[in-house]
Regions:
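GT-A fold catalytic core of metal-dependent nucleotide-sugar glycosyltransferases
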Residues: 143-197
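N-proximal low-complexity "stem/linker" segments adjacent to membrane-targeting elements
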Residues: 10-56
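Short loop/turn segments at strand-loop or loop-helix junctions that form parts
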Residues: 32-41, 100-104, 167-169, 201
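Short, acidic, metal-binding catalytic loop of nucleotide-sugar glycosyltransferases
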Residues: 54-70
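Conserved catalytic core of nucleotide-sugar-dependent glycosyltransferases
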Residues: 173-228
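Short, charged/polar "capping" segments at the starts of alpha-helices
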Residues: 77-84, 206-208
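Short internal beta-strands
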Residues: 72-76
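Active-site-proximal specificity loops/subdomain of glycosyltransferases
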Residues: 92-157
Length: 228
């Protein structure tokens, strides 16, 4: 785990780079952001440390929702109204596209059924080190997988610009790294080089694959990764 000094140093670098890369008026294309929100009951999680209510997610979203890029949100019809209201607070409703999805668990129903079956397998339960981890919840794993489904769906619907970035709805958990929410108040432009970019917390090859699978150590953050 990084120490506080490492985090602060990284944060200072981020702010400096952001100021250099946010070159409005250049030929760089605007980045389209894609996210999703579905209440799968994490507010009732047995582990209090992992518990995240819908209200908490909306508060976390409100911090970064001021970013001025076009934002595509996959969510249910009820949550859509709250999300639109939050973006409207920053005058960004016209740059917000809601894709109402009220049949989340029917989109890949066969896959969800297989995940649920695996989650009940005793060998699976005995193997996992943390029995109450979110990743043991088939609905959580299904929703995680749907990030890629939604990115592809947005592409097929013609909603994306040339550059697209996924942002987790609850990104940064309310200010763990980016303590000043005003740091999100900018239009993000960046000249991606045509590759998929994924930010890793550590070298994934530095640990044994089976160990990572059992302990579910975080390696890839579900935020700010993009492609062009």
């Amino acid at each position: 785990m990084q120490g506080a000094s490492d985090t602060n140093s990284w944060y200072d670098c981020y702010r400096g780079l952001r100021n250099k890369l946010n070159l409005e008026g250049t030929e760089m294309g605007e980045i389209t952001l894609v996210t999703d929100f579905f209440d799968i009951g994490r507010g009732q999680d047995k582990n209090e440390e992992l518990r995240r209510t819908a209200s908490k997610y909306f508060d976390e979203f409100r911090r970064w929702a001021r970013i001025q890029n076009k934002l595509i949100v996959y969510t249910d019809s009820k949550s859509a109204e709250t999300i639109k209201a939050i973006r409207a607070e920053y005058g960004l409703l016209d740059k917000t596209v809601i894709v109402a999805t009220d049949n989340l668990f029917e989109l890949e129903g066969d896959l969800l059924a297989r995940m649920e079956k695996a989650s009940r397998n005793q060998d699976f339960l005995d193997f996992r080190y943390l029995p109450e981890a979110s990743s043991n919840n088939p609905k959580y794993d299904y929703l995680w997988m749907m990030k890629y489904y939604f990115m592809n769906d947005a592409y097929e619907k013609g909603l994306l610009t040339e550059d697209v970035v996924w942002m987790d709805f609850g990104f940064d958990h309310g200010g763990i790294t980016y303590s000043d929410e005003k740091d999100y108040d900018f239009l993000w432009n960046y000249d991606f080089n045509g590759k998929i970019h994924i930010s890793c917390l550590y070298d994934p090859d530095a640990r044994i694959g089976m160990e990572t699978l059992q302990f579910q150590n975080d390696c890839v953050m579900g935020c700010m990764y993009g492609l062009s």
